[in-house]
A protein has these predicted regions:
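Multi-pass alpha-helical transporter architecture, strongest
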Residues: 20-22, 209-243, 249-250
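Helix-to-loop junctions at the C-terminal end of transmembrane segments
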Residues: 97-111, 195-196
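Pair of pore-lining "gating" transmembrane helices in MFS-fold secondary transporters
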Residues: 44-64, 144-148
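A membrane-interface helix-boundary motif in multi-pass transporters
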Residues: 1-11, 80, 193-213
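C-terminal membrane-cytosol helix-exit motif in multi-pass small-molecule transporters
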Residues: 6, 11-31, 218-223
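Juxtamembrane intracellular "pre-TM" segments in multi-pass secondary transporters
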Residues: 23-54
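C-terminal transmembrane helical hairpin of 12-TM major facilitator-type secondary transporters
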Residues: 112-157
Length: 250
């Protein structure tokens, strides 16, 4: 199979995706035009910045490791080069399943909780693959798990950005993508630093771990803010209900 066949397959997949979006995604009305300046108002709040930072740090953490998954598998885990396509396929399957699993349970948990929990599992998987990379089954399983976590948290993070954006939803979605791409680039650079210093390939997971840890910290703060506000709203509803009961009492 020539290299042109791979491009043809990718183009066919893109065409199928385009057709599926046209068929399955419902039409929605255009967003109201609130003016240019209004699109930036949501950036006055803390929460969008926390989520944007977490998107960059979390994805940067994963790609610090994943950018060097080939040398990790071949030189540390002793996975044959002929099996690398299987490893990459498993990681891709993990991404799909992580996204689907998050969607399945999204009605039972808040987006803040899902994002923080997924980020927590991501950082633990990166720490684990650093120590267990010499055992090929663990290295492959943890790589798949980490890949699943990245796309597990992507949905809740996008929802959090859109929900906090108000008049600037398109800008928020764009900034989330910018943060994602910046995290990928910076993460790949940081992951390569230990290798440049002569360390084994599994050391790429260490910068990834600390990036993911920082991202988890931001999402944890975001979750705390959400929890405090939920408690305040609950207390307000209880107080209003008490006042209503007292007003009806003889």
């Amino acid at each position: 199979m020539s290299w042109r066949a791979a491009f043809a397959i990718a183009a066919a997949a893109a065409l199928i995706t385009f057709a599926a979006i046209r068929i399955t995604v419902p039409k929605v009305p255009a967003l109201p035009d609130s003016g240019f300046a209004a699109q930036f108002r949501f950036l006055r709040s803390l929460e969008p910045w926390l989520v944007l930072g977490a998107i960059g740090l979390g994805n940067g953490g994963f790609f610090a490791y994943y950018s060097y998954v080939n040398p990790v598998m071949e030189h540390v885990a002793a996975v044959p080069a002929s099996m690398m396509s299987v490893v990459i396929t498993l990681a891709g399957a993990g991404m799909v399943l992580g996204n689907l699993f998050c969607a399945k349970i999204s009605s039972s948990f808040s987006d803040e909780s899902l994002a923080a929990a997924g980020q927590g599992v991501l950082l633990l998987s990166l720490a684990s693959v650093f120590f267990l990379a010499h055992w090929s089954p663990a290295a492959i399983a943890l790589t798949t798990l980490a890949a699943g976590c990245v796309f597990f948290i992507s949905g809740p993070e996008q929802v959090l950005m859109i929900r906090n954006a108000k008049e600037g939803q398109l800008l928020a979605a764009s900034l989330a993508q910018v943060s994602f791409n910046a995290g990928n680039a910076v993460g790949a650079w940081l992951g390569g630093l230990p290798l440049d210093a002569g360390k084994a390939a599994n050391w790429a997971a260490m910068p990834g771990f600390f990036l993911a840890l920082a991202g988890f910290g931001l999402l944890f703060v975001n979750w705390l803010i959400h929890r405090v506000r939920e408690e305040e709203r609950t207390a307000g509803r209880i107080a209003a209900l008490k006042d209503q009961i007292q007003s009806k009492a003889p």
